[in-house]
């Protein structure tokens, strides 16, 4: 499925697609009782992209907290044994003996692969990304150097994986060449560090940032009560427009990317240390 998604991504006749990731754990289908500000900002970005003729795909990670059986299992850290032991896409699940089944990542890998760009919208939880978002990030390690051929290591054979890496591994970047934008918001502290962590991660994986206006971090209702935070977002028309600008910047980047012009201004340099 990921291979088919890669073909759709590369097909110049296919529609331009942007994956919108809602990183919040909060929604109106469980204990919080109301939608997140993150989802509202994502909807602003989605509407802007669709007005620009971009096909959108909304990946709402808050469903992990509100849908029965919805799971992203944790990364097992195969890459730290040897990079070729980590498969693209991940082959660690399902593990029926441990009841590690129904892994959402099997679908999520395909959705990332098919997208020409991604916009991640996320709140700050304790200076960091929320756990649903971090689970997905960790499981995407296989996109940066992962082995697309599990048979090369006879499945999960550490010795064979180590031998492959020592013989020379090129650490293929399976999602490189896609554009990205970020919207990170908080109420008291941590927005810049959280946004930089996401930027650094995507840069490392070979994504291309869509420009300074595509990387947004803002406080909404700074030191105001949580109970009125949606009112604060209602009043903050500037941050709503900035969210639209993130989407506009990404939409323009996708056009340039698919025409080959965005890559043309990127330095095509070999990495002396590709890990």
Q: For each of these PLM feature ranges, what is it?
A:
Residues 219-233:
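Short helix/strand-capping connector loops at secondary-structure junctions
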């Amino acid at each position: 499925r990921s291979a088919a998604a890669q073909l759709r991504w590369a097909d110049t006749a296919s529609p331009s697609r942007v994956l919108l990731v809602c990183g919040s754990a909060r929604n109106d289908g469980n204990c919080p009782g109301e939608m997140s500000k993150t989802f509202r900002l994502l909807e602003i970005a989605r509407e802007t992209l669709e007005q620009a003729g971009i096909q959108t795909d909304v990946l709402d990670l808050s469903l992990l907290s509100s849908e029965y059986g919805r799971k992203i299992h944790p990364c097992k850290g195969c890459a730290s044994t040897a990079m070729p032991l980590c498969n693209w896409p991940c082959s660690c699940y399902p593990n029926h003996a441990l009841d590690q089944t129904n892994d959402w990542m099997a679908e999520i890998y395909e959705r990332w692969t098919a997208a020409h760009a991604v916009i991640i919208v996320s709140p700050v939880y304790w200076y960091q990304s929320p756990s649903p978002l971090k689970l997905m990030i960790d499981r995407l390690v296989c996109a940066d150097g992962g082995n697309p051929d599990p048979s090369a290591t006879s499945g999960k054979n550490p010795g064979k994986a180590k031998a492959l890496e020592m013989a020379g591994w090129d650490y293929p970047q399976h999602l490189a060449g896609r554009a990205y934008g970020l919207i990170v918001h908080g109420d008291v502290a941590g927005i810049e560090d959280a946004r930089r962590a996401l930027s650094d991660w995507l840069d490392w994986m070979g994504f291309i940032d869509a420009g300074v206006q595509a990387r947004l971090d803002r406080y909404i209702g700074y030191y105001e009560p949580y109970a009125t935070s949606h009112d604060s977002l209602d009043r903050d028309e500037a941050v709503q427009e900035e969210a639209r600008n993130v989407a506009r910047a990404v939409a323009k980047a996708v056009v340039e990317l698919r025409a080959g012009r965005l890559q043309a201004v990127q330095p095509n340099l070999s990495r002396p240390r590709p890990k």
